[in-house]
Amino acid sequence: EIIRQGQTDFIGYSGPAGGDWDMLIGCGRIKAFINCYIANSGYTNVCRRFRDAVEKKHNLLLEDYSQDVIMLMLHASSLGLPYLPVKLMEGSDLEYKWGISAEIRKTIPKLPDKKLERIPNPFKEGEDVIAVPVPRLDTAIISVQKASINGTCSIEGDEFHDIDIAIAARKVIVIAEEIVTEEEIR
């Protein structure tokens, strides 16, 4: 529906992603994508539309975090935190290479000014941590197996980051395989 309506310039945050994001990227709907990994399904080749956008330098801004850090960022968003201190990316290229420069970030109000900031650990003198920004989500889209007409949802299987983004977002769009009664879902 997003593709059909022609809406563009979305800022997308996602943990491990797949075909859903690949379609949006391929249709030019995503302005900036903050992610850790995107593949066609499971752990296969990188999504082809995403790969094309990156290799041919289409207008996709990309910021890369490690999988554990992006998942923690989404959880921190559900807790209402402004930033998250981590040690997980220390010494890696993810700490030193920014996909979206500070100059470009300042032109996009929905993006934080920096990818990260090395700050002193307030609990251990002489030690630093990496502070990463926590996203402020406008809308989350989650897929569930069952939902009631009142919005109660049931996820059967892995939840991944769906619960965190549903709590964090101002609005939630739920895609349900089946609409059931309140009695059945409770």
PLM region descriptions:
Residues 1-186:
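Conserved alpha/beta enzyme-core scaffold
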